[in-house]
Amino acid sequence: MTSTIALNYTPTIDGAASHYDDLDSFYREIWGEHVHHGMWLTGKETDTEAAENLVTLVAKLGGTGKGSDVCDVGCGYGATAKILAERYGANVTGMTISKMQWRYAQEHNDVPGKTT
């Protein structure tokens, strides 16, 4: 077994964006609209339900409510932003470096005045 370590590798924003864009369909197949792990409360939740459980916990811990301003850095496909806007009435700004994720979020998260 061999391994290689790139000692002179310098990550760039463009490189990271390309990574997410190149693996877009893979990420959506594996993660769905949530590009993060979840929280299984019973062990019987689907991956999506577990991801939404985690969003719910974070929203509660953060005191998210009607009129809250939230910046979702690394928003991926916008699923978390959509939940925070629809369920909690938050004003959410989502940020991603991936053009593919941004395009998907724009096409699938129609919450006027709440998500960008």
Model-inferred region functions:
Residues M1-E29:
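N-terminal auxiliary segments of SAM/dcSAM-dependent transferases
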Residues S18, K60-T64, L84-E86:
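Short, charge-rich binding segments
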Residues Y20, V58, S98:
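Conserved hydrophobic/aromatic pocket- or pore-lining residues that grip, position, or stack substrates
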Residues E33-L41, E45-K66:
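Conserved alpha-helix/loop element of class I SAM-dependent methyltransferases that forms part
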Residues D69-C71, T80-T116:
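Class I SAM-dependent methyltransferase SAM/SAH-binding core
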Residues G74:
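Conserved S-adenosyl-L-methionine
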Residues Y77:
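Conserved SAM/SAH-binding loop
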